[in-house]
Amino acid sequence: MSCGFIHLILGPMFSGKSTELIRLVNRYQIATYNCRVIKYSKDNRYGNDAVYTHDKCYISAVSTDSLFDIKDTLDDVDIVGIDEGQFFNDIVEFCEYIANKGKIVIVAALDGTYERKPFGNILNLIPLSEKVTKLNAICMICHRDASFSKRLSDEKEIELIGGKEKYLSVCRSCYLT
């Protein structure tokens, strides 16, 4: 049995996680691998049939809120890309299952909430990943490297999907002010 591997791409809002996911999947597509990208069904800001970056670059995708619900559609797939991995409750078990089937899994996800706490169980994927990439954004206040996402509203729910109208990428100093 050939084993696949897991590549986890982490970072705050606006750090280029989805852009990197799209870039990596496109490389595999050029090399004629059969690829499938999965997106979180509740993130429909730009549409339901593709993963979009904030600057409207996109790649075709299937939407779901449970990864295992679509596992049977992946038999002929070599590469599985997952965007917004932090929102999937079954992300850890699914990625391990798919990688153990010999497939390459690339996951883009926020590592922390707007409160700088672990987002869902995404950090539990780190010990199972062969490669972990941590991206930084640019602080939208002082323009230094930004490692955190700061919410602009007083809404308290963890799952609040949005872009620049709801979040800033910030450095430590600007997060605390």
UniProtKB/Swiss-Prot annotation:
Zn(2+) binds at residues 139, 142, 171, 174. Keywords: ATP-binding, DNA synthesis, Kinase, Metal-binding, Nucleotide-binding, Transferase, Zinc. It is an enzyme of class 2 (transferase). Pfam families: TK. The active site is at 84 (proton acceptor). Its EC number is 2.7.1.21. Substrate binds at residues 114, 158-162. ATP binds at residues 11-18. GO terms for molecular function: ATP binding; metal ion binding; thymidine kinase activity. It catalyses: thymidine + ATP = dTMP + ADP + H(+). GO terms for biological process: DNA biosynthetic process; thymidine metabolic process. Belongs to the thymidine kinase family. This is Thymidine kinase. It comes from Swinepox virus (strain Kasza) (SWPV). The lineage of its organism: Viruses, Varidnaviria, Bamfordvirae, Nucleocytoviricota, Pokkesviricetes.
